[in-house]
């Protein structure tokens, strides 16, 4: 049976249809908002997956180009691997949903969000997030806590829910909020140095709208939802857990209280070895339970240490940052480099400057755009002392790179101020938590070292949270390390400048965050950020005055847009000639802005002169130094500007009578000529005679003076 339900969000209809499409899926939901439509299919395996200690949830976000009436480019003509943006959207859908599944649920669950129609005013990723939650609620899968999602913009001090395409261009904030009826589950934001109080108010503004959407989903689930399948939860064998606990708890506690990471890990390895010797032969079919028992003890010790003893595993105060250091100009041949170290987390960032044309073109289901600033993040296995094959970037690396890019992008100078494409690569050399935020700091160092005139330096920090089972007690931690992230309840990343926030990413392992927790995390993050910025400023307090001698030189000029065709020439003949003769790269914008990228000053200036020549208007009455290109019986043809020739009639070659053109000029001679006429057909008539007379008159005037 087909069911249709709808509500209104920000003055537009949010509509769902369930039961018509995808009949063999557990739930296939067709959800629309304006003319944007996403088909969400959810399915789960009938039995739990054996031999794993995590919940196997898979979120896929698929963009179909037919959604915007496009045919894929390239030879194959079909969609390939997901774009980076699709991967980021899938990760964003995963984060608020995963904590709301029952603990111990081990069935494979797959959520596939296929974007099938898009209008640019209504974002498909926001619709997909709402659709994924609603589809899970309607299915037989044991998911019963709806999540509402909205985007929030900020224009002239006013918050806007789900801004349209035009409003998004004007907005200084791009905020996504996901929440249940009770608590915020996920936050993702990018902004132009948003003050902390304004950011908090924006989150709360979005939260109120999320509550309404979650309430709508709850009512739809109660009216149309399938009966939930019988819940099979993985539970550790109670007897084995008791035995392992009695044998090892004191050893685990002693090991976890060691403040040095390497010593603590070594001590825990010894504990695990003793437990293995004691129980592996006794319970050969329950090795997973034995490992889980050890994990639960570690988690209990760490959380009790923080909540009840008010201390952290490494001995720091709750608001204390690990030791910091910064360094620049590490690599002699790169355009800019920076090394940022926070405790055992260390990131080296390297900046490269290129021509405007080397920016990245973004062509997908949204309007085609390009970006000048790119950030890529690499997390090799050696950064955690492990051995793994080196592959291409995984979803986590793409996500962390995008977050650090979002944090820096609002601070990059405009194309007119700094006409370069910029790429920063952050290499994680050592990881003990918060590498994405260390990448923000490393990027700042590298950009300043490269001479990029950033608006202000930026830094990032990760805040953590530990709560009691009843959520009554909670402690917020500044600058979480790996152990606190692993056993904690929240990863609250905040990046920005001394003026305000440029990026936030928040996810949680519990059923949401209290408003007080969000406010305190944002406030404490600012204090930590200012401390880090002080360290960065002590290392390099302003951009280098000049770019590296190894960086390309960029020259700019403006030409009349109507002359662009003259500079390019038929089939690109003219512009290719300039490139061949000078070895430069040339980018011309529709408004007539010209960017010339050269390896040295001389070739850049030569290219500018040639472009100026091709784009200049020939004017009557002006005198030019031209080159004779051809001789005829009736006169000489002279090139006065690149690609622009005129005729000097034999009668105009000299002040005295000329019988033969060759008596006065030869091909290749440079002569002064005056433009006497541009006829109705655009032909240019020149006179050497008039140019000579003008020159003599000017000399006479100078003599009189």
UniProtKB/Swiss-Prot annotation:
Q: What HAMAP family does UniProt report for this protein, alphabetically? A: PNPase
Function of the protein: Involved in mRNA degradation. Catalyzes the phosphorolysis of single-stranded polyribonucleotides processively in the 3'- to 5'-direction.
Q: Which residues form a coiled coil?
A: none
Primary enzyme class: transferase
Instruction: Enumerate the residues binding Mg(2+).
Output: 485, 491
One function term, GO molecular function aspect: magnesium ion binding
Localization recorded for this chain is: Cytoplasm
What is the protein's given name?
Polyribonucleotide nucleotidyltransferase
The species is Clostridium novyi (strain NT)
Family named by the database record: Belongs to the polyribonucleotide nucleotidyltransferase family.
Domain KH per the UniProt entry, residue ranges: 552-611
Q: Which lineage?
A: Bacteria, Bacillati, Bacillota, Clostridia, Eubacteriales
């Amino acid at each position: 049976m087909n069911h249709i339900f709808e509500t209104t969000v920000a003055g537009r209809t949010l509509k769902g249809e369930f039961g018509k499409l995808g009949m063999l899926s557990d739930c296939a939901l067709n959800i629309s908002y304006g003319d944007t439509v996403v088909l969400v299919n959810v399915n789960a395996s009938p039995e739990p997956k054996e031999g794993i200690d995590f919940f196997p949830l898979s979120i896929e976000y698929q963009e179909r180009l037919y959604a915007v009436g496009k045919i894929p480019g390239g030879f194959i003509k079909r969609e390939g691997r997901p774009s980076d943006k699709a991967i980021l959207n899938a990760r964003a859908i995963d984060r608020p949903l995963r904590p709301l599944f029952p603990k111990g649920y081990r069935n494979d669950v797959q959520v596939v969000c296929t974007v099938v129609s898009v209008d640019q005013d209504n974002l498909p990723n926001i619709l997909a997030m709402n659709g994924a939650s609603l589809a899970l609620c309607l299915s037989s899968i044991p998911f019963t806590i709806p999540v509402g999602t909205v985007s929030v913009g900020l224009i002239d001090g006013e918050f806007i829910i789900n801004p349209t395409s035009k409003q998004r261009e004007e907005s200084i904030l791009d905020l996504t909020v996901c929440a249940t009826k009770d608590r915020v589950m996920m936050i993702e934001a990018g902004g132009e140095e948003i003050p902390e109080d304004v950011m908090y108010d924006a989150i709360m503004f979005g939260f109120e709208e999320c509550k309404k959407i979650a309430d709508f989903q709850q009512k739809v689930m109660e009216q149309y939802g399938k009966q939930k399948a019988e819940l099979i939860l993985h539970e550790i064998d109670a007897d084995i857990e008791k035995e392992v606990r009695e044998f090892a708890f004191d050893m685990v506690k002693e090991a976890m209280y060691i403040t040095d990471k390497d010593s603590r890990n070594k001590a825990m390895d010894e504990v695990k070895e003793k437990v293995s010797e004691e129980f592996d032969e006794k319970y050969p079919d329950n090795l997973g339970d034995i490992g889980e028992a050890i994990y639960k003890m570690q988690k209990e010790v760490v959380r009790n240490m923080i909540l009840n003893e008010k201390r952290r595993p490494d001995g720091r105060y709750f608001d204390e940052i690990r030791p910091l250091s910064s360094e620049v100009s590490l690599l002699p041949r790169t355009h800019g480099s920076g090394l940022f170290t926070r405790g055992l987390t260390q990131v080296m960032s390297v900046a490269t400057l290129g021509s405007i044309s080397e920016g990245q073109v973004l062509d997908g289901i949204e309007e085609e755009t390009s970006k000048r600033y790119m950030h890529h993040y690499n997390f090799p296995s050696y950064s955690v002392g492990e051995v793994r094959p080196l592959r291409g970037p995984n979803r986590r690396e793409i996500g962390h790179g995008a977050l650090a890019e979002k944090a820096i992008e609002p601070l990059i100078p405009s194309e007119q101020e700094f006409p370069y494409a910029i790429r920063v690569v952050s290499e994680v050399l050592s990881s003990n938590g918060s590498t994405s935020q260390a990448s923000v700091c490393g990027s700042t160092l590298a950009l300043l070292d490269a001479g990029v005139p950033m608006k202000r330096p930026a830094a990032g920090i990760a805040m953590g949270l530990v709560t009691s089972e009843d959520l009554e007690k909670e402690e917020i931690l500044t600058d979480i390390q790996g152990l606190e992230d692993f056993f904690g309840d929240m990863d609250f990343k905040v990046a920005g400048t001394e003026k305000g926030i440029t990026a936030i990413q928040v996810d949680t392992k519990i059923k949401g965050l209290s408003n007080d927790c969000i406010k305190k995390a944002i406030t404490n993050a600012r204090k930590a950020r200012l401390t880090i910025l002080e360290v960065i400023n002590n290392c390099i307090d302003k951009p280098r005055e000049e770019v590296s001698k190894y960086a390309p030189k960029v020259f700019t000029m403006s030409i009349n847009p109507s002359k662009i065709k003259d500079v390019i020439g038929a089939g690109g003949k003219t512009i290719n000639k300039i490139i061949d003769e000078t070895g430069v790269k040339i980018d011309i914008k529709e408004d007539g802005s010209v960017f010339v990228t050269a390896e040295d000053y001389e070739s850049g200036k030569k290219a500018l002169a040639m472009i100026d020549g091709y784009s200049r208007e020939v004017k009557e009455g002006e005198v030019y130094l031209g080159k004779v290109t051809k001789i005829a019986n009736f006169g000489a043809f002279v090139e006065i500007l690149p690609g622009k020739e005129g005729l000097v009639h034999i009668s105009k070659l000299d002040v005295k009578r000329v019988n033969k053109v060759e008596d006065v000029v030869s091909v290749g001679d440079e002569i002064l000529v005056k433009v006497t006429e541009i006829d109705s057909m655009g032909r240019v008539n020149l006179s050497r005679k008039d140019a000579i007379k003008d020159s003599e008159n000017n000399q006479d005037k100078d003599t009189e003076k």
